[in-house]
Every structure is written in C-alpha cells, then in structure tokens.
Amino acid sequence: MKLALDPSMYRDDLTLEEMVYKTAELGYEYIELSPREDFCPFYKYPKVDSAKIKQLKRLLRDTGVKLSSLLPLYHWAGPDEDRRQAAVRNWKRAIEIAVELEVDLMNSEFSGSKYDPLTSEEKFIKSMDELLPVFEKEGIKLNLQAHPYDFIETHKGAMDMIRALDKDWINLVYSTAHTFFYDDGKGDIETMFDEAGDRLTHVLFADTYNHKAAHGLRYIVNPPDAKVTVHQHLDIGQGEVDFDTIFRKLREMKFDGIATNAVFAWVDERADESSRFMLKKMKEELGLA
C-alpha cells in the first residue's frame, strides 16, 4: 500500500523543491502530485519543461520520496467543444510528463457539467476515443472519481462509466470527502465499497459534513436556487463520514492500493499538524503502524 500526501495545502506557499522536502519532513513516502501553477495547473496547459522534470526527479532521489500518481484536471468532458479540444491537448502533454517522471498512474475527475450531463457524457467519450490509445501506448493507468458539481456525482454513475470504458487499467478513486454526494446523503459505505469491489484501487481521505442533513437546511445559499455545491476536506473525526466502516471494509478487502491524505482545510492554521495526524491515523487504521 502507498500512503501519499496531496500537497494542496502547501502549493501556494512553497516552491516545488520546498514541497518535496516538506513531504519528507512530515513522514510521507509518496506525493500525489495535484495541480500547481508551475507544473500542471488547473485546466491550463502544463507549464513544466524537461529541465524542471529532471529537477523534480533529482529532488525525489535526494529525499527518498516517490510519486504515487500525477493528478491533472482538464475539461475533457466539455461541454464546450473548444474546452474539450484544449483538454485533450493538455492531457497528451500531461501523459508525456508522467512518462518522463516514470509515473505509471494518473488520476482525475470526469470534469464535465452537472447541468448538461448528456452533452458532457458525449464529450467525455469522444475524448476517451482519442486518449485511450495514448494511455495504452505509454503504459499509463488511470483512476477516476465522481465529484460534486460534475456530470457524474454519484458512486453508481462512476462505476457505470468505468465499466462502460471496459479497461482493466481504468479503476475507481473513492474520495471520502464526497461520500454524501455519492449516494444522495445516505453515506452507505458498505454498499458502495461492495459495489466497487476490486475496482477500488485509490482512496482519498478527508472528512466532511452531510450537506443533505436537516432537510437540506445544513447549508443555506442565497439565492435559494443558486447553482452551487458545498463540501469540506477536514481531518478524520471532524465531520460525519463513517470512517469506522471505511477502515473495516478496507481491511476486509485487503486493500493494497493508494491511500492519500486529501485534507485541504487548514492552509492558514495547522497544515503540518493536520498532515501528521492524518498519516498517523491512516497507518493505525489500515494496519500499517
């Protein structure tokens, strides 16, 4: 099993070099390299050259830290066609970067529009038609997650699409912070993990509150029909996700994939404390302490 840090809490304050050293200082062996402006930015063309890639590989060797995966985010499901075409170009470059980094796994989201799901699905499949041969040629695996505000928000929707793609190298990312979006507020971990089975190869750990609680009055948004979604990425125990069941199921399943600390809430307050707590908690509950 790989225990990784998503360094999002550090990306705006630390250089790439400082981020790698910080990861080592916190005790993590792996980095899940999420978007940052000087590497693979959110939704924009990658801003990294061969020299920076070599620098990163040297930093990783010096610290003993490894990359568990590269996490790009691009609008490959449109629904705007210009955005989709740009996303495919961005993905092709990101795959080249993964190959240069000697990383054989990328993870991402479906990245379409909640309010135009049919067009988004059509655009996503069109992008897959172009990109699947590139992934296969380069030997890169892909893990995908449903996400709030995406055209696929639910666990069932994610599993249906992963099965539709029908590639044994495309599997599921389960983000615990999205649990209540995955099944419309029920938070039924047991059922979702049983449904995923051996497709569950990647878990992002963070806690959240149930946005469906209090008859929908947990979060009050003005105007009432505003097109928004709300969730958190908190330390385990600070929200309402059933982590007892999550860890029990992962132990029963003999989960041996990637477990990533994906807490983002404490950038300005207690990032180091939170990151150390999450690593300790994951190790203890996954039987790695």
UniProtKB/Swiss-Prot annotation:
Segments forming a coiled coil: none
InterPro entries: IolE/XylAMocC-like, Xyl_isomerase-like_sf, Xyl_isomerase-like_TIM-brl
Positions of transmembrane segments: none
Signal peptide region: none
One Pfam family this sequence matches: AP_endonuc_2
Record pathway: Polyol metabolism; myo-inositol degradation into acetyl-CoA
Protein name: Protein IolH
Natural source organism: Bacillus subtilis (strain 168)
